[in-house]
């Protein structure tokens, strides 16, 4: 999972992720922004569920993050509909709307993001 941190002309941090993990970048850009307390909450949840059968999720404005003992899933809230609403032959998966990654990989990105932001 490759990533890049940039600053736009206003100084806002932007995250770009490799193909297949774009939604992780969108989550940072839309939900985290400068809210490092959200990252505190996510890291605490990851420690709580790691190695267990439990899971944790937090719905944001645009994206929901879901963590279990091994992986992290981030999905666009627009995917939050029942199967009855889906047209036949349609799939929930959309690279722009859903991403899965290992918990350790995700936590490495969180740590790198914190480091980048602190270098303001």
Swiss-Prot record:
Kindly give the InterPro entries that the UniProt entry links to this protein. Answer: UPF0231
The superkingdom of the source organism is Bacteria
For this chain, the family text in UniProt reads:
Belongs to the UPF0231 family.
Q: What is the protein's name according to its record?
A: UPF0231 protein YacL
Gene encoding this chain?
A: yacL
């Amino acid at each position: 999972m490759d990533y890049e941190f940039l600053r736009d002309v206003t100084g806002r941090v932007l995250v770009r992720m490799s193909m297949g993990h774009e939604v992780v970048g969108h989550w940072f850009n839309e939900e985290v922004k400068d809210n490092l307390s959200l990252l505190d909450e996510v890291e605490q949840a990851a420690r709580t569920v790691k190695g267990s059968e439990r899971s944790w999720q937090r719905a944001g404005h645009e994206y929901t993050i879901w963590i279990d003992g091994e992986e992290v899933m981030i999905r666009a809230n627009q995917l939050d509909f029942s199967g009855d609403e889906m047209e036949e032959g349609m799939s929930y998966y959309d690279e722009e709307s859903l991403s899965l990654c290992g918990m350790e990989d995700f936590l490495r990105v969180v740590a790198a993001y914190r480091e980048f932001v602190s270098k303001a």
